[in-house]
Amino acid sequence: MLRKLFSATTLAGALAGTAMAQSPDAGCALPSEPKGIPAAIDAAITGPADKDRACMKALLIPEARMMFVSLGTDGATTYRLETLDDWIARVKARGHAMLEEKQLKFHIERYGNIAHLWSSYALHSDGKPVARGINSIQAIKEAGGWRVTGIMVQAESATAPLPKEYLP
């Protein structure tokens, strides 16, 4: 259950010093380069589960979707598709639990105004590890900076451990 609840909070890590542009939507900083996306997502996620998500809403385009993929013990793939508002409601139900996401490693591919980020992450709730996994993030460059168009997440499981090349 925790894996499903928190796997959306994937990505990020500290990329201090990344130049930021101002978002027209909520006054939140949008990354000026794709390498700033993980830190922007991390900053928007980290904190109390019931915190204001205005910066997360500014970072994702309104049509963005989040897909959470999991493998059953029998190896069967299942997925859940959510809007950002769906995710916010689900996470908010955790109350004041402190969420902290840390990026382990990431790789970026970019062509013009589109980018794809492949990111491994570790998620903690109230200081305790609850999930690790991989994020696949798609982004687009707009006038104010880079925004996320979609996030696909698969949390680590007994049948799909995180490969060593994605660990620190």
Question: Regions from the language model: what does each represent?
Answer:
Residues 2, 21-59, 166-168:
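Short, low-complexity N-terminal intrinsically disordered segments enriched in polar/charged residues
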Residues 8-16:
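Bacterial N-terminal signal peptides
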Residues 56, 64, 117, 139:
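Hydrophobic pocket/interface hotspot
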Residues 41-49, 60-64, 68, 88-91, ...:
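Sec/Tat-exported extracytoplasmic proteins
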Residues 60, 70, 119-121, 135, ...:
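A mature extracytoplasmic/lumenal domain signature
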Residues 22, 65-66, 78-129:
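Surface-exposed, charged secondary-structure patches
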Residues 132-160:
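Short beta-strand edge/turn micro-motifs at domain boundaries
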Residues 1-9:
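Bacterial N-terminal signal peptides that target proteins for export
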